[in-house]
């Protein structure tokens, strides 16, 4: 079986499991399936394997923390009026890129994905403050990246002759 067909089967089946988990047992923790899917994609974007797993979790969590901080400084920047949020996001974006000077934070796209996932959860408007959004976001990132790793492993088993 080709790798692409094996990944099709593996990812398709595991997406069913992940969605069930997030809409069922994990829903009480405010974890989000869409955040997990972003982390799952980031895992493959980072080349998969253990290295892709580590890069995804470390950089997405870093991005999420920076994103949380960016949202939190919008209030103190309120004197800027309509520019408060754009300036806060710009500061956060600069921090993400500066962080890439550290080799373990060099996967800038994954850091951006992390920033976007926490900001997205905050913007859903379900009484989700920045500090309330960070833990479910980090948990969703970890679980999503783990699903990426498992899907790769399962596909590997299906392609062995």
Feature names for model-found ranges:
Residues 20-36, 73-90:
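Structural signature of hydrophobic alpha-helical transmembrane segments
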Residues 53-62, 83-86, 105-114:
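Cytoplasmic-side transmembrane-helix entry/capping segments in multi-pass membrane proteins
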Residues 33-71:
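Alpha-helical membrane segments and adjacent membrane-interface helices in multi-pass membrane proteins
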Residues 11-24, 60, 64-72, 89-101, ...:
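Transmembrane alpha-helical segments of multi-pass membrane transport proteins and ion-pumping complexes
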Residues 74-79, 124-132:
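Membrane-interface helix termini and inter-helical loops of multi-pass transporters
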Residues 6, 29-32, 80-88, 105-109, ...:
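Membrane-interface starts of transmembrane alpha-helices
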Residues 12, 16, 29-47, 92-94, ...:
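Pore- and pathway-forming membrane helices of multi-pass small-molecule/ion transporters and channels
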Residues 1-48, 130-133, 137, 144-155, ...:
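Alpha-helical transmembrane segments and their membrane-interface boundaries
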